[in-house]
């Protein structure tokens, strides 16, 4: 991949058919126009006040530079010269250049001396998705189009063509590697003293699933769908075996794969339905439904008060640096029970648990607070208390049946220091959630918890990349200034 070689461009035709970065300067023709005959006192199209009617017009006809799109243009340029030195795409590429992607290179089957076309460099695909995530691009088709039209994406590609199938497959094909990258990137910041895990804020955000409300069906309907899907697969298989035409066989094979995938999704939906029914009471089991599109999605109450198919994305963020330190995705509609797994995730990733964790009332379950605050874990919980049922009772005074960890939590939350510390929760967790939404984390375009979590990891790594740049900037300036 070369970004610095000179390219000679000789163009004849319409300039508006070229990419944005294809032309740097265009000569136009000078024409004269007749003054407008409309009333000069009328407001102009863009609300610019008209000339003073008493002011005499300048002598001669006005001269304007008019657009000329049929002019032949020659340009000598390189991709590297088209991208500013301080562009964010360069930051992303520099980060990817320092990653250990040996696991991806070991999976490349195209080798020197062997048959087949060359594989796309994994660094290009990694950089494309990181930069696209920062720019709010979540569609593989849209990203593939940008790789042909937009100078920043073209610079990352460096002349390598990338199709949307390759981009789509790469995005969800390596969840273990992305998980490892998150751990290593945060560990590097911890080694530099930029992240301490002294205080971590956790929050969940409900993100729309790639499924419609009409895809949720009850058991009887799912069983009927399963039967119809199996029959369709058998019919297409028989049709494929009987038709000798190559092109027709190719189309029929695609139809058979689609039918087989639908049959598998319906089967998964039946399995998920059994789990849903096991959590419901007897009278509510008949109302249990599962999606045939994304069986692992659940109908959740969204921020606007509506109910839609969604996944619950959990981010844990270091309050001092706003670096995402933990990622989890569940299909539970509430945040109950999500604090202990996240604390354990930090122990598994970094060999230490957060000293303090800040959560909202949805996480404040007594058994979870006790588990996290136990001497074996040693994490201090800051979470709001529920309003007491008995009027006039001080909520910060321990109840007679409280164990030591719960009593300490109640007393702690009544202190001015705890109330001041808890203010950091919204400033950290809510801020990271808002940034993720601004970058496009509003609806998933993939299905299944594993793929959804993989996409969430892309957001976390991209976010941490920019936070690392900001955190290291003062040290870099000190070195330059010193």
Region locations from a protein language model:
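A general alpha-helix detector
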Residues: 78, 124-130, 166, 184
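Short, solvent-exposed coil/turn linker segments
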Residues: 78-81, 100, 218
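A short secondary-structure junction motif
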Residues: 99-103, 150, 154, 439
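N- or domain-start disorder-to-order transition segments that initiate the globular core
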Residues: 65-74, 82-86
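Anion-binding and metal-coordination hotspots
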Residues: 2, 8-49, 54-60, 65-66, ...
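Basic, short loop/linker segments at the boundary and entry of helix-turn-helix/winged-helix-like folds
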Residues: 83-130, 135
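Short, charged, low-complexity loops and linkers
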Residues: 79-83, 419-420
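Secondary-structure junction/capping motif
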Residues: 78, 86-87, 91, 121, ...
